[in-house]
Amino acid sequence: MDREHYIKDMPEHIEKIRAQVARISASEEICQQAMQLIMEIVESSNSVVIIDANDIRDSLDCDGTLAVNDIRINAKVHDRMKELVGQIEKKIGNNATVKSLLFHLFFPEELPLQMSELQPLSDWLSSFQSETDFKVRWGMTATSHFSHSLNNTSQEPLLRAIVLAVTCNYQ
């Protein structure tokens, strides 16, 4: 599908995504938060690695419960990806229960992510059980407006991860 048709069909894609999110959300609040973050991903410009509506729909196409996380750290700290992945791990919890993972990294244009920095992320993703039907979709966007984010009174540039995880419903 070309870009023109993709954009024209976006409202239909969003409605399908909204239905999927509603089905796996534990509450209306989680559903709304997830949709707000998904819209940020879909509408992000200057993406280095793109997540499109089809990627989002595929990652949400499973049974379970949706966990929504928006994690932000100072983009100037040493080992920033290690710190960010550590924060994600704290929020997600037990990797064995994660069936599907969608995450999008936002980084300041003036402090771009280097390939060499992504090793902690790669190590973390490899910790998921490969014999399961685990799905992962990810993207990255450079942004020039990162000091405006919530709870950022110091106006420092931020490294941010939007993480949507579908976890198993074990009783």
Residue locations for each model-derived region?
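Tubulin/FtsZ superfamily GTPase core signature
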Residues: 1-171
